[in-house]
């Protein structure tokens, strides 16, 4: 589909990204309709997908998406958790209508329910998991674009993009490549410069890991460091403050000892009292 144009050819940078994200790895099983996209079979039974055909199918899908005048008429869907973040990011940059999570049966066929939609194009992440919307789209003649693995069935699928649709990084990268190509065809971004948004923005993130990162960040801001000016104002060689309650002071000890000695010398209550009592008693008695 590149038509021999150098500007549409698969670059080495994109190939390295696909290989790093394992977008070329299929499964051990292969559907008879997907055999044409298999490059070879490894000794462990895993089928390798031909990335050149992946890129050609990606260009076809991008041209179909760019040909729709109203971007909101494009419905992107992913029931698989690894593709929900990628679907939301794709809808944010291209203006499509996302459905992340469980698909409500009858969304495309039941006009009574509030979630009823009439899209002109449907894009799904996995034909096996998203079989319900694909079946409903076939009832109302909605064309379907799907990311297909080697074991995916192509029934009711108009354009199948062969890739690894089970890996978290592979799904995010394929949605990122599709969004970038759509924006290039619309003229939003240039082909001469790289897109400012990186592929990891479309990658799946574990909610527990995100919560741990936020908690660590909050703990970091909750414990501010001591100001340098304040630490410089307090000298480090300051004399330690003694606790007066632990040991009595020298003055208190000396004062208590002197009072005790004075009290011992002036014990007039025993000596004087005895002489006075004896003298008075003798005089009165005589």
Swiss-Prot record:
Biased composition (Low complexity): 227-241
Keyword vocabulary terms for this entry: Cytoplasm, Ribonucleoprotein, Ribosomal protein
Compartments, record wording: Cytoplasm
Positions of region (Disordered): 213-286
Keyword Translocase: no
GO biological process, one term: cytoplasmic translation
Entry's Gene Ontology molecular function annotations: structural constituent of ribosome
Principal place of residence: cytoplasm
Biased composition (Gly residues): 274-286
Entry keyword annotation includes Transmembrane: no
CDD domains: RPS2
An annotated GO cellular component: cytosolic small ribosomal subunit
Highest taxon, organism lineage: Eukaryota
One Pfam family, short name: Ribosomal_S2
Bias kind Polar residues: ranges: 244-270
Function in brief: Required for the assembly and/or stability of the 40S ribosomal subunit. Required for the processing of the 20S rRNA-precursor to mature 18S rRNA in a late step of the maturation of 40S ribosomal subunits.
Subunit structure: Component of the small ribosomal subunit. Mature ribosomes consist of a small (40S) and a large (60S) subunit. The 40S subunit contains about 33 different proteins and 1 molecule of RNA (18S). The 60S subunit contains about 49 different proteins and 3 molecules of RNA (28S, 5.8S and 5S). Interacts with ribosomal protein S21.
Protein family according to the UniProt entry: Belongs to the universal ribosomal protein uS2 family.
The protein, known as: Small ribosomal subunit protein uS2
Organism: Trichoplax adhaerens (Trichoplax reptans)
């Amino acid at each position: 589909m590149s038509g021999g144009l150098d500007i549409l050819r698969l670059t080495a940078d994109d190939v390295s990204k696909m290989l790093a994200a394992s977008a070329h790895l299929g499964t051990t099983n292969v559907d008879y309709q997907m055999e044409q996209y298999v490059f070879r079979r490894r000794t462990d039974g895993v089928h390798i997908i031909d990335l050149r055909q992946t890129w050609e199918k990606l260009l076809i899908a991008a041209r179909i998406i760019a040909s729709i005048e109203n971007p909101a008429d494009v419905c992107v869907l992913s029931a698989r958790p690894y593709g929900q973040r990628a679907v939301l990011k794709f809808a944010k940059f291209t203006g499509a209508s996302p459905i992340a999570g469980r698909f409500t049966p009858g969304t495309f066929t039941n006009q009574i329910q509030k979630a009823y939609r009439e899209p002109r194009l449907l894009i799904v992440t996995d034909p096996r998991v998203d079989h319900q919307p694909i079946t409903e789209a076939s009832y109302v003649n909605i064309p379907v674009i799907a990311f297909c693995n080697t074991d995916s069935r192509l029934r009711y699928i108009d354009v199948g993009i062969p890739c690894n649709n089970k890996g978290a990084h592979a799904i995010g990268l394929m949605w990122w490549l599709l969004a970038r190509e759509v924006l290039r065809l619309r003229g939003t971004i240039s082909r001469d410069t790289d897109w400012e948004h990186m592929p990891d923005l479309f990658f799946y993130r574990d909610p527990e890991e995100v919560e741990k990162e936020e908690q660590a960040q909050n703990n970091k801001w909750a414990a501010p460091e001591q100001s340098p000016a304040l630490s410089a104002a307090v000298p480090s060689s300051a004399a330690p403050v003694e606790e007066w309650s632990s040991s009595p002071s020298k003055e208190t000890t000396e004062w208590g000892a002197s009072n005790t000695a004075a009290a011992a010398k002036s014990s007039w209550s025993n000596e004087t009292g005895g002489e006075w009592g004896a003298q008075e008693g003798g005089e009165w008695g005589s």
